[in-house]
Amino acid sequence: MQNSLPIELISIVRNLEEKARSVGLDFFTTMFELVDYKQLNEIAAYGGFPTRYPHWRWGMEYERLSKSYTYGLSVIYEMVINNDPCYAYLLRANSLVAQKTVVAHVYGHSDFFKNNFWFSKTNRKMLNQMANHATIVRKIIDEVGQEEVENFIDVCLSLENLIDIQAPFKAKPKTLTQEQKEKAIHQPVTKIESKPYMDSYVNPNDFLEKQQSRIVEQAKKLQSFPEEPVQDVLKFLIEYAPMSTWQRRVLSMIRDENYYFAPQAQTKILNEGWATYWHSKMMTSIAPLDASEIIDYCDHYSGVVASQPGQINPYRLGVELLRHIEERWDKGRFGKSYVETDDPKTRRDWNTSINLGAKKLFEVRSLHNDVTFIDEFLDEDFCHKSKMFLYDYNTRTGKFVISNRDFKEIKKTILKQLTNIGQPIIKVIDGNFKNRGELLLHHFHDGDDLKYDYLLECIKNIYKIWTRPVHIETLVENVKRRIAFDGNTHTIEKI
């Protein structure tokens, strides 16, 4: 796709790139392409990439985006790909003011992709990788047939969230050989050396019993399969499920792609806040707009940060919290002295003019994801200043009403929504359950029950890959249940 920029836009891009680098942004080489709304919807339907493996979900997403644009419900102003070089798409129909804003916004994203810790393990050549995946799937379709491949991809996509988003940053566990396992299982109880007459005091029975219990527990652990609960369910299926070579390859590709997209979900608020912070700064002070453009910019900006009761706007929350951090660190509103000050007037007037705000913002950009960002910096002052509340829907009036103003509850609710990117934590507990090769999963309950219809379809699709009965333990209305699918029927039992 080659859509060269007009001379006027090239000049804008060069100017904003120079200004962005001058304030410390460090981004990949960024390539801009100009596209119409149909082309942008196609790219957006593909998850931001110009090509993907053939599947009906892309067409469905394109129809949704097209109708949303036609009815005036949404407009995509830009798309940016985490790649080196970074590719960004500009909507041809945008006004010149919008194009300037979007270009500045893109440089913020590109800087974030390059420097944020949570993106450090992503494939920086994913544009090529996606094209390779598309080629591989097309070859498999030619060999196996479209319907069979498409049906298997349907199954894989329904399970794509069963990964461990922390896995790229975890050290690989040491694996023991069978000989080492046998030695550990049959090791004798270790006694502390002592004189015979002191043995009963140095090695009392309760000490020896504890040692024996530890050995027994370790033996059980080493003999279990897997030895530790595995959150990356897809990896477990890839390694141990009885699949054909092409199926294993397709599932591996879908897993790899989901790991690529995971950091974007983990940092949505901070990433969008960072890009919005810099496009706002660029348009108003670093590379200011003309007086004739300010009204259009403000109208565009107000649309970006608009919020509604009961919903989190990541652009608004991200940029406002970053500005709050900047103000706090510029005025020295951190540390023991400030935290221990209870007087509201003293806190409000606190200003040591330390001016560490900019330095702190770059530190936040480098180290945090949404959970740590909110957990560390969302404080009571910000909550009150931003008028953040919890809302419930009133069925009688048909409106959202404030249900809770308590800061701790508000923060807890936001963090709960963000933990594990909003997905349930499910782990493989036993790959040989009942000693019959059946699969046992466990849902780590966080207060919310699993959606029952989703749960039934999930274990049904895992069965299609595992080919043996699949069980999952969870809480249903605070009662421990084990739900299973044996290839024909679902069963549920109390445990």
State each model region's role.
Residues Q2-L5, L9, R92, F113, ...:
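Fold-level signature of zinc-dependent metallopeptidase catalytic domains
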Residues I7-C86, L208-A241, I472-E473, N478-D486:
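Auxiliary, metal-adjacent structural segments of Zn-dependent hydrolase domains
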Residues L65, P85-V102, F261-T267:
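Short pre-active-site segment immediately N-terminal to the catalytic Zn-binding motif
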Residues A93, V97, A291-I495:
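Non-catalytic terminal regions of proteins
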Residues H105:
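TRNA-recognition modules of translation machinery and tRNA-sensing kinases, especially anticodon-binding
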Residues G108-E179, E272-L289, S302-G310:
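Post-HExxH zinc-binding segment in Zn-dependent metallohydrolases
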Residues T135-R138, D154-M243, Q247-L251, Y315-F407:
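Well-ordered beta-sheet/strand-loop patches within structured domains
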Residues Q218-V319, R323-H324:
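Long, internal scaffold/assembly segments composed of regular secondary structure
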